[in-house]
Amino acid sequence: MSGTDMNVHKRTAAREAADMVKSGMVVGLGTGSTAAYMIERLGERVAEGLEIFGIPTSDDSEDKALKAGIPLTDFSAHRRIDIAIDGADEVQRGSLNLIKGLGGALLREKIVAQAAKRFVVIVDGTKPVDLLGERAPVPVEVISFGWECTAERLAACGARGVKPRTDRAGSLFVTDTGNMILDCHFGPIEKPEELAEKIDRIVGVVEHGMFLNMASEVLVATPDGVEHWEP
Protein backbone atom coordinates (compact mmCIF):
# COMPACT_ATOMS: atom_id res chain seq x y z
CA MET A 1 0.00 0.00 0.00
CA SER A 2 1.43 3.37 -1.02
CA GLY A 3 1.77 6.31 1.33
CA THR A 4 -0.94 8.11 -0.61
CA ASP A 5 -3.35 5.21 -0.22
CA MET A 6 -2.55 5.00 3.50
CA ASN A 7 -3.34 8.68 3.96
CA VAL A 8 -6.67 8.21 2.19
CA HIS A 9 -7.55 5.36 4.55
CA LYS A 10 -6.44 7.33 7.62
CA ARG A 11 -8.50 10.30 6.54
CA THR A 12 -11.57 8.07 6.16
CA ALA A 13 -11.12 6.66 9.68
CA ALA A 14 -10.43 10.08 11.17
CA ARG A 15 -13.55 11.56 9.63
CA GLU A 16 -15.59 8.61 10.91
CA ALA A 17 -14.27 9.26 14.41
CA ALA A 18 -15.11 12.95 14.11
CA ASP A 19 -18.66 12.03 13.18
CA MET A 20 -19.05 10.37 16.61
CA VAL A 21 -19.04 13.83 18.19
CA LYS A 22 -22.40 15.34 19.16
CA SER A 23 -23.46 18.89 19.97
CA GLY A 24 -22.81 19.90 23.55
CA MET A 25 -19.67 17.80 23.88
CA VAL A 26 -16.23 18.83 25.11
CA VAL A 27 -13.77 17.15 22.76
CA GLY A 28 -10.10 16.29 23.30
CA LEU A 29 -8.24 17.15 20.11
CA GLY A 30 -5.28 14.87 19.41
CA THR A 31 -1.96 15.65 17.80
CA GLY A 32 -0.38 14.34 14.60
CA SER A 33 -1.20 13.72 10.96
CA THR A 34 -4.17 11.44 11.62
CA ALA A 35 -5.66 13.74 14.26
CA ALA A 36 -5.30 16.62 11.80
CA TYR A 37 -7.86 14.95 9.53
CA MET A 38 -10.22 14.64 12.49
CA ILE A 39 -9.82 18.33 13.34
CA GLU A 40 -10.47 19.22 9.72
CA ARG A 41 -13.75 17.26 9.75
CA LEU A 42 -14.84 18.75 13.08
CA GLY A 43 -14.27 22.19 11.61
CA GLU A 44 -16.58 21.31 8.73
CA ARG A 45 -19.23 20.12 11.17
CA VAL A 46 -18.92 23.25 13.31
CA ALA A 47 -19.50 25.32 10.17
CA GLU A 48 -22.64 23.22 9.61
CA GLY A 49 -23.94 24.00 13.11
CA LEU A 50 -22.25 21.52 15.48
CA GLU A 51 -21.81 23.15 18.89
CA ILE A 52 -18.76 21.87 20.76
CA PHE A 53 -15.70 23.01 22.66
CA GLY A 54 -12.27 21.53 22.04
CA ILE A 55 -9.31 21.01 24.36
CA PRO A 56 -6.14 20.62 22.25
CA THR A 57 -3.27 18.34 23.21
CA SER A 58 -0.55 20.54 21.69
CA ASP A 59 0.17 24.00 20.37
CA ASP A 60 0.02 22.54 16.86
CA SER A 61 -3.46 21.11 17.42
CA GLU A 62 -4.57 24.40 18.93
CA ASP A 63 -3.43 26.24 15.79
CA LYS A 64 -5.22 23.74 13.55
CA ALA A 65 -8.41 23.93 15.62
CA LEU A 66 -8.48 27.73 15.55
CA LYS A 67 -7.96 27.74 11.78
CA ALA A 68 -10.79 25.20 11.46
CA GLY A 69 -13.11 27.43 13.49
CA ILE A 70 -13.46 25.12 16.50
CA PRO A 71 -14.18 26.99 19.77
CA LEU A 72 -11.64 26.08 22.45
CA THR A 73 -11.79 25.74 26.21
CA ASP A 74 -9.53 24.39 28.97
CA PHE A 75 -9.61 22.45 32.22
CA SER A 76 -10.33 25.55 34.29
CA ALA A 77 -13.81 25.52 32.75
CA HIS A 78 -14.28 21.78 32.15
CA ARG A 79 -12.73 19.08 34.32
CA ARG A 80 -14.11 16.24 32.22
CA ILE A 81 -14.00 15.60 28.49
CA ASP A 82 -16.83 13.77 26.76
CA ILE A 83 -14.69 12.24 24.02
CA ALA A 84 -11.00 12.44 23.12
CA ILE A 85 -9.84 11.43 19.65
CA ASP A 86 -6.17 10.87 18.84
CA GLY A 87 -3.73 8.72 16.88
CA ALA A 88 -1.15 6.23 18.17
CA ASP A 89 2.25 4.88 17.19
CA GLU A 90 1.47 1.31 18.22
CA VAL A 91 -1.66 -0.49 19.41
CA GLN A 92 -1.50 -3.93 21.01
CA ARG A 93 -4.03 -6.39 19.65
CA GLY A 94 -6.53 -7.50 22.27
CA SER A 95 -5.65 -5.17 25.16
CA LEU A 96 -5.60 -2.01 23.01
CA ASN A 97 -2.63 -0.77 25.03
CA LEU A 98 -0.83 1.98 23.15
CA ILE A 99 2.50 3.64 22.57
CA LYS A 100 2.06 7.32 21.85
CA GLY A 101 4.29 10.36 21.81
CA LEU A 102 6.44 10.15 18.70
CA GLY A 103 4.80 13.46 17.81
CA GLY A 104 6.17 14.98 21.01
CA ALA A 105 2.90 15.67 22.86
CA LEU A 106 2.57 12.60 25.08
CA LEU A 107 2.13 14.45 28.40
CA ARG A 108 -0.78 16.61 27.31
CA GLU A 109 -2.21 13.70 25.30
CA LYS A 110 -2.26 11.49 28.40
CA ILE A 111 -3.80 14.20 30.58
CA VAL A 112 -6.58 14.63 28.02
CA ALA A 113 -7.08 10.88 27.56
CA GLN A 114 -7.32 10.34 31.32
CA ALA A 115 -9.92 13.10 31.63
CA ALA A 116 -12.05 11.67 28.82
CA LYS A 117 -15.17 9.58 29.36
CA ARG A 118 -14.43 7.97 25.99
CA PHE A 119 -11.02 7.74 24.32
CA VAL A 120 -11.14 6.88 20.62
CA VAL A 121 -7.88 6.09 18.82
CA ILE A 122 -7.32 6.17 15.06
CA VAL A 123 -4.50 4.19 13.41
CA ASP A 124 -3.55 2.79 10.04
CA GLY A 125 -2.90 -0.88 9.39
CA THR A 126 0.84 -0.62 10.15
CA LYS A 127 0.30 0.25 13.83
CA PRO A 128 -1.21 -2.95 15.35
CA VAL A 129 1.34 -5.21 17.08
CA ASP A 130 1.27 -8.33 19.23
CA LEU A 131 3.49 -6.71 21.88
CA LEU A 132 4.22 -3.04 22.51
CA GLY A 133 7.72 -2.05 21.51
CA GLU A 134 7.93 -4.31 18.47
CA ARG A 135 8.48 -1.34 16.17
CA ALA A 136 8.28 1.88 18.16
CA PRO A 137 10.44 3.14 21.01
CA VAL A 138 8.77 4.21 24.24
CA PRO A 139 9.02 8.02 24.43
CA VAL A 140 9.74 9.22 27.95
CA GLU A 141 9.32 12.91 28.78
CA VAL A 142 11.94 14.07 31.30
CA ILE A 143 13.12 17.33 32.79
CA SER A 144 16.34 18.57 31.23
CA PHE A 145 18.26 18.86 34.52
CA GLY A 146 20.27 15.68 34.97
CA TRP A 147 18.76 13.99 31.94
CA GLU A 148 21.96 12.00 31.46
CA CYS A 149 21.39 10.35 34.86
CA THR A 150 17.74 9.76 34.02
CA ALA A 151 18.80 8.09 30.77
CA GLU A 152 21.10 5.71 32.66
CA ARG A 153 18.26 4.71 34.97
CA LEU A 154 15.99 4.08 31.99
CA ALA A 155 18.68 1.88 30.46
CA ALA A 156 18.80 -0.04 33.74
CA CYS A 157 15.08 -0.78 33.26
CA GLY A 158 16.00 -2.78 30.18
CA ALA A 159 16.17 -0.24 27.37
CA ARG A 160 18.59 -1.40 24.68
CA GLY A 161 19.10 2.18 23.61
CA VAL A 162 18.13 5.55 25.08
CA LYS A 163 18.40 8.50 22.73
CA PRO A 164 17.51 12.14 23.36
CA ARG A 165 15.16 13.36 20.67
CA THR A 166 16.38 16.15 18.41
CA ASP A 167 14.56 18.53 16.10
CA ARG A 168 15.17 19.02 12.40
CA ALA A 169 18.03 21.40 13.13
CA GLY A 170 19.76 18.80 15.27
CA SER A 171 19.07 20.60 18.55
CA LEU A 172 17.46 18.89 21.52
CA PHE A 173 13.70 18.68 21.02
CA VAL A 174 11.70 20.69 23.56
CA THR A 175 8.07 19.79 24.28
CA ASP A 176 5.27 22.34 24.59
CA THR A 177 5.68 22.01 28.36
CA GLY A 178 9.41 22.75 28.20
CA ASN A 179 10.78 19.25 28.73
CA MET A 180 12.94 16.78 26.79
CA ILE A 181 12.02 13.40 25.35
CA LEU A 182 14.19 10.30 25.60
CA ASP A 183 13.27 7.61 23.06
CA CYS A 184 13.79 4.25 24.77
CA HIS A 185 14.14 1.10 22.68
CA PHE A 186 13.02 -1.84 24.80
CA GLY A 187 12.06 -4.23 22.02
CA PRO A 188 8.91 -6.33 22.55
CA ILE A 189 7.55 -5.62 26.03
CA GLU A 190 6.12 -8.72 27.73
CA LYS A 191 4.90 -6.95 30.88
CA PRO A 192 4.12 -3.29 30.12
CA GLU A 193 2.49 -2.63 33.50
CA GLU A 194 5.65 -3.68 35.35
CA LEU A 195 7.83 -1.58 33.06
CA ALA A 196 5.53 1.42 33.53
CA GLU A 197 5.85 1.13 37.31
CA LYS A 198 9.65 1.02 37.08
CA ILE A 199 9.77 4.09 34.84
CA ASP A 200 7.34 5.99 37.06
CA ARG A 201 9.67 5.52 40.02
CA ILE A 202 12.61 7.25 38.31
CA VAL A 203 13.19 10.79 39.58
CA GLY A 204 13.32 13.16 36.62
CA VAL A 205 10.70 11.32 34.59
CA VAL A 206 7.63 13.43 33.88
CA GLU A 207 5.59 10.86 31.93
CA HIS A 208 6.02 7.91 29.56
CA GLY A 209 4.30 7.08 26.31
CA MET A 210 2.67 3.79 27.28
CA PHE A 211 -1.09 4.34 27.46
CA LEU A 212 -2.26 1.25 29.32
CA ASN A 213 -5.93 0.34 29.69
CA MET A 214 -7.00 3.77 28.45
CA ALA A 215 -8.45 3.30 24.95
CA SER A 216 -12.21 2.80 24.71
CA GLU A 217 -12.13 1.99 21.02
CA VAL A 218 -9.62 1.83 18.17
CA LEU A 219 -10.47 2.58 14.55
CA VAL A 220 -8.05 0.79 12.21
CA ALA A 221 -7.89 2.15 8.67
CA THR A 222 -7.42 -0.68 6.14
CA PRO A 223 -7.78 -0.99 2.36
CA ASP A 224 -11.03 -2.88 3.00
CA GLY A 225 -12.53 -0.24 5.25
CA VAL A 226 -12.44 0.88 8.87
CA GLU A 227 -12.25 -1.82 11.53
CA HIS A 228 -13.61 -1.09 15.02
CA TRP A 229 -11.72 -2.72 17.89
CA GLU A 230 -12.77 -2.71 21.53
CA PRO A 231 -10.92 -4.13 24.57
Curated annotation (Swiss-Prot):
<dbReference type="Pfam" id="PF06026">
    <property type="entry name" value="Rib_5-P_isom_A"/>
</dbReference>
<feature type="binding site">
    <location>
        <begin position="100"/>
        <end position="103"/>
    </location>
    <ligand>
        <name>substrate</name>
    </ligand>
</feature>
<comment type="function">
    <text>Catalyzes the reversible conversion of ribose-5-phosphate to ribulose 5-phosphate.</text>
</comment>
<feature type="binding site">
    <location>
        <begin position="86"/>
        <end position="89"/>
    </location>
    <ligand>
        <name>substrate</name>
    </ligand>
</feature>
<feature type="active site" description="Proton acceptor">
    <location>
        <position position="109"/>
    </location>
</feature>
<protein>
    <recommendedName>
        <fullName>Ribose-5-phosphate isomerase A</fullName>
        <ecNumber>5.3.1.6</ecNumber>
    </recommendedName>
</protein>
<keyword id="KW-0413">Isomerase</keyword>
<comment type="pathway">
    <text>Carbohydrate degradation; pentose phosphate pathway; D-ribose 5-phosphate from D-ribulose 5-phosphate (non-oxidative stage): step 1/1.</text>
</comment>
<feature type="binding site">
    <location>
        <begin position="31"/>
        <end position="34"/>
    </location>
    <ligand>
        <name>substrate</name>
    </ligand>
</feature>
<dbReference type="GO" id="GO:0009052">
    <property type="term" value="P:pentose-phosphate shunt, non-oxidative branch"/>
</dbReference>
<comment type="subunit">
    <text>Homodimer.</text>
</comment>
<dbReference type="InterPro" id="IPR037171">
    <property type="entry name" value="NagB/RpiA_transferase-like"/>
</dbReference>
<dbReference type="GO" id="GO:0004751">
    <property type="term" value="F:ribose-5-phosphate isomerase activity"/>
</dbReference>
<feature type="binding site">
    <location>
        <position position="127"/>
    </location>
    <ligand>
        <name>substrate</name>
    </ligand>
</feature>
<dbReference type="InterPro" id="IPR020672">
    <property type="entry name" value="Ribose5P_isomerase_typA_subgr"/>
</dbReference>
<dbReference type="InterPro" id="IPR004788">
    <property type="entry name" value="Ribose5P_isomerase_type_A"/>
</dbReference>
<dbReference type="InterPro" id="IPR050262">
    <property type="entry name" value="Ribose-5P_isomerase"/>
</dbReference>
<comment type="similarity">
    <text>Belongs to the ribose 5-phosphate isomerase family.</text>
</comment>
